[in-house]
Amino acid sequence: ESIEGTIKLYNNQVFIADNIKEVIPEFLMLLKGVIDCPDLPLNVSRSALQNDGFVKKISDYITKKVADKLSGMCKTDKEEYEKYWDDISPFIKFGCLKDTKFCEKMSDYVLFKNLDDKYLTFKECLEENKDKHENTIFYTNDPVQQSQYVNMFKAEGIDAVVLKDAIDQPFISQLEQKNENVKFVRIDADLNDSFTEEISEDELKDATEKLTETFKKALNRDKLDVKVQKIKDEKVSSMITVSEESRRMQDMMKM
C-alpha cells in the first residue's frame, strides 16, 4: 500500500488537481488534506504553475506550517513527537536536504535514536558524549550485523546512534558540512583507544613480527605494514575495521 498522501487543490470549491508538486513539496507528499484558494490558477499546466509567484508562496507557506507544527510538538510534547519520529524521519531529513528554510526550522528537532532507544537531538548527542569523544558521533547502520561492536561500546559506556535509512548518509554529510568540527564515524570504522590496552614493547614487537610474516605469506605480498593492538575484551579475538573515509568512498562508487 502506498504511503503517499493526497492534497486536493480547489479554487472556490472548484476542483483543480491533486498532488501538484509545484504546490506540495516532494518531501511532504505523505500529507493528506484540502487546499481551497481563490488565487490558484485554474490552468494547472506545469509551466503555468512554475511561473506563478503565488503558487511558490503557497508552497513556502505549507512548508513553514508543517515545520512550525512539528517543532512546536517537539517543544511541548516531545514524548508524543517521538512516537511519530521513526515514521516521519526519512521525510524530514529529505526535506532538510531539499529545502534550506525547512532545514533551518527543523535542524534542532531532528532526532537520533541511541543504543538504549533514547531519542536525542544533534546538540544532545554532542553534549552527552563530549567527555569521551568530543565532536564525534558514533553510529551503527545495522545493530544486528554489528552487534559485536555494539556490545563493546555498551561495555565501555560509549554511546552511538542508529542510522538505518538510505537518506541518513547524505543527511549526516550535510551536517558535517554545516558543522566543520563534527564527524560521524561508524562504530566499526576504527579501533577506539577505549577498546585497547597497552602491552610491553617486547610483546608488541614479537606479535607484530609474527603477524606480519603470516599475512605476507597469506596475501602473497612482500611489502605489507601490520599494526598490532591488543583488544581489551578477551571475548573478541579480532576485529575488521575500514576507515570512515574509505568506506564512504566505496559506498559512493556503488551508487
Report each predicted region and the residues it spans:
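Conserved GHKL (Bergerat-fold) ATPase module
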Residues: 1-255
